[in-house]
């Protein structure tokens, strides 16, 4: 098993001779030294020299140094500056609260604030349901984390996890028009987390739990679902399960392995793995084999209808293997059987790379970069809030899966997560399922389902 390094993205500002083939020689050198080329931006074009910003993706800082050493040997190229593209993008954060109205005069001020706002307050005193018309509560969600399970970084704390939570908020705003408000908790006590969420729930139309370690995340989700009258989702559980099942359905189209007939093995039974197992059981009617590092995790899997197994048994007998352990390199090439479907979903590095799995005989192999929760949660939340659903039912998640499968191009495992039409389709499917499940508190007419862009329905 290899040591894990995190990918590093840097921008090289390069001054190169304005001659045919020089740029090609530079990008070839980058590729030959094991780095990937990202965006190339022209800064200036001159008679003798051109200046370009070239994004490169390397394994670590040592690899970057080796790359720069090789580039320096190109006589026609000078590296003027090395910049951290990711840090530059995150400067001052990725989100901010903005007004939906302008205050440009005293008349505006009197309407937006005092004394005019008192009329709206009195209306809500008489009937709190007017909040759906006169506040942004229905289209705001709390994104709550205690920082104990941040991506592949683990227990790094809430503040260190804020860039991840900001990213979720930015994406759900762009793709679904929903205000995601980061809530960083300075506690890991499950009772305090539940109580905090309950105390602030009046501010929001829904609550998304994020990056909370198992097993506490299971108890927190179940308790909030039971005690709140607004929808609650844990993206690491249901969000991951939705996109994984959708991608497995897509994989069956060109692997020849049908989910309902396949033996499925789950390696890793934390928030993601356990939820994937529960979804697969509901979808296929068949239990999955499951293994994990702790007996408690395996016991929970069995309690939810799964079968206790081992890494060796799963790799030797399962048609489909889904790994969510967070342990890079756990699955060795020699373990892969010809024709298997391998989903190694841990980030930033998978249990086995798709290339290695395919080389070992896997019919289909992918990782967590390709199977991305982003294809699911924006549309799930949009449809849920549009229907003013009191909860998110399994049928609503299945409706999201169906929409994702239908939106996926032939030969692909998942659709483009940045396609606005995808999230609109998911939202419509989820909203219709909310109506059918009788958890919708808002009736939606045909005009809503015929909308071609995401916009708020009549309230």
Predicted segments, located by residue:
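Glycine-rich phosphate/diphosphate-binding loop of Rossmann-like nucleotide-binding domains
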Residues: 151, 158-176, 228, 234, ...
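Short glycine/serine/threonine-rich phosphate/pyrophosphate-binding segments
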Residues: 22-23, 135, 151-153, 217, ...
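Rossmann-like adenosine-cofactor binding region
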Residues: 304-365
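Glycine/serine-rich phosphate-binding loop and adjoining beta1-alpha1 elements at the start
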Residues: 79-260, 381, 385, 437-439
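A conserved regulatory-domain signal marking ACT and ACT-like small-molecule sensing domains
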Residues: 1-91
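Adenosine-phosphate binding glycine-rich loop
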Residues: 235-236, 346, 351-444
């Amino acid at each position: 098993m290899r040591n894990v390094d995190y990918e590093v993205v840097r921008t090289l500002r390069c001054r190169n001779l304005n001659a045919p083939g020089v740029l090609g020689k530079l990008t070839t050198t980058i590729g030959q030294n094991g780095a990937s080329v990202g965006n190339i931006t022209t800064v200036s074009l001159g008679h003798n020299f051109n200046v370009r910003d070239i994004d490169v993706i390397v394994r670590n800082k040592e690899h970057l140094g080796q790359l720069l050493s090789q580039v320096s040997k190109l006589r026609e190229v000078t590296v003027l500056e090395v910049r951290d593209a990711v840090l530059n993008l995150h400067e001052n954060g990725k989100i901010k609260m903005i007004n939906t109205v302008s205050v440009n005069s005293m008349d505006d001020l009197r309407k937006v604030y005092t004394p005019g706002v008192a009329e709206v307050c009195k209306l809500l005193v008489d009937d709190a349901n007017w909040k759906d018309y006169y506040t942004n509560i229905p289209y705001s969600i709390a994104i709550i984390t205690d920082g104990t399970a941040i991506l592949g970084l683990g227990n790094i704390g809430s503040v260190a996890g804020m860039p991840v939570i900001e990213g979720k908020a930015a994406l759900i705003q762009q793709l679904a028009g929903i205000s995601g408000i980061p809530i960083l908790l300075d506690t890991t006590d499950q009772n305090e987390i539940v109580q905090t969420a309950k105390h602030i729930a009046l501010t929001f139309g829904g609550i998304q739990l994020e990056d909370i370690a198992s097993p506490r995340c299971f108890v927190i989700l179940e308790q909030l679902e039971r005690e709140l009258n607004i929808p609650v989702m844990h993206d690491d559980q249901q969000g991951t399960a939705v996109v994984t099942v959708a991608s497995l359905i897509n994989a069956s189209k060109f692997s020849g392995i049908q989910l309902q007939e396949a033996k499925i093995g789950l390696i890793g039974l934390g928030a993601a793995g356990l939820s994937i197992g529960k979804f697969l059981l509901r979808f296929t009617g068949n239990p999955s084999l499951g293994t994990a590092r702790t007996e408690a995790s395996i016991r929970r899997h069995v309690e939810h209808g799964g079968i206790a197994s081992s890494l060796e048994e799963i790799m030797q007998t399962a048609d489909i293997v889904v790994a969510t352990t967070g342990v890079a390199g756990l699955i060795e090439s020699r373990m892969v059987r010809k024709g298997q479907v391998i989903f190694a979903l841990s980030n930033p590095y998978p249990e086995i790379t798709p290339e290695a799995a395919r080389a070992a005989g896997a019919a289909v192999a992918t990782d967590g970069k390709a199977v991305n929760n982003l294809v699911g949660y924006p549309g799930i939340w949009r449809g849920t809030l549009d229907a003013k659903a009191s909860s998110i039912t399994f049928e609503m998640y299945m409706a999201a899966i169906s929409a994702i499968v239908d939106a996926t191009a032939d030969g692909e495992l998942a659709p483009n997560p940045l396609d606005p039409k995808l999230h609109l389709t998911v939202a419509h499917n989820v909203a219709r399922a909310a109506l059918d499940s009788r958890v919708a508190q808002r009736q939606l007419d045909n005009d809503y389902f015929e909308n071609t862009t995401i916009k708020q329905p009549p309230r």
